[in-house]
Curated annotation (Swiss-Prot):
<keyword id="KW-0813">Transport</keyword>
<keyword id="KW-0915">Sodium</keyword>
<keyword id="KW-0812">Transmembrane</keyword>
<comment type="similarity">
    <text>Belongs to the fluoride channel Fluc/FEX (TC 1.A.43) family.</text>
</comment>
<feature type="transmembrane region" description="Helical">
    <location>
        <begin position="70"/>
        <end position="90"/>
    </location>
</feature>
<keyword id="KW-1133">Transmembrane helix</keyword>
<feature type="transmembrane region" description="Helical">
    <location>
        <begin position="105"/>
        <end position="125"/>
    </location>
</feature>
<keyword id="KW-1003">Cell membrane</keyword>
<dbReference type="GO" id="GO:0062054">
    <property type="term" value="F:fluoride channel activity"/>
</dbReference>
<dbReference type="InterPro" id="IPR003691">
    <property type="entry name" value="FluC"/>
</dbReference>
<feature type="binding site">
    <location>
        <position position="77"/>
    </location>
    <ligand>
        <name>Na(+)</name>
    </ligand>
</feature>
<dbReference type="GO" id="GO:0046872">
    <property type="term" value="F:metal ion binding"/>
</dbReference>
<dbReference type="GO" id="GO:0140114">
    <property type="term" value="P:cellular detoxification of fluoride"/>
</dbReference>
<feature type="transmembrane region" description="Helical">
    <location>
        <begin position="5"/>
        <end position="25"/>
    </location>
</feature>
<feature type="binding site">
    <location>
        <position position="80"/>
    </location>
    <ligand>
        <name>Na(+)</name>
    </ligand>
</feature>
<keyword id="KW-0472">Membrane</keyword>
<keyword id="KW-0997">Cell inner membrane</keyword>
Length: 132
């Protein structure tokens, strides 16, 4: 199968996962703030930090380039969404809700960077374990 097809399949899986999770979060917390997008971006950031480190050449898990592209470009590229974050922030600004817009920008940036770092740290710990 072509690499592009693997990435497309991963993207389809990731986008369906994003739609489901962000919808559940929005149902639970409401839509006055883009909680669903924030949650999927933070979760996706943790997973990519973890997976990238775990499957790096010195990592514990041997995954080929196709598998890495399937997960990181396809699944996680479809799961996370910078464009929705941008549009939702713009909509908050257009509605005059500067506080929530600023909170979305700062919160997303800080939480996603912390999440990718925590994912990396978790995989470093797993990579350092002895044995299988």
């Amino acid at each position: 199968m072509s690499l592009y097809l693997y990435i497309a399949l991963g993207g389809a899986l990731g986008s369906v996962g994003r739609f489901a999770l962000s919808g559940l979060v929005a149902q639970h917390y409401g839509e006055t703030f883009p909680w669903g997008t924030l949650v999927v971006n933070v979760v996706g950031s943790f997973i990519i930090g973890f997976f990238a480190t775990l499957t790096a050449p010195e990592g514990r898990m041997l995954v080929g380039a196709t598998g890495r592209h399937f997960v990181m470009t396809g699944v996680l590229g479809g799961f996370t969404t910078f464009s929705s974050f941008s549009l939702q922030t713009l909509n908050l600004l257009r509605d005059g809700d500067w506080g929530r817009a600023g909170g979305n920008v700062v919160g997303s940036l800080v939480l996603c960077l912390v999440a990718v770092w925590l994912g990396h740290i978790a995989a470093v710990g797993l990579n350092s374990l002895k044995g299988s």
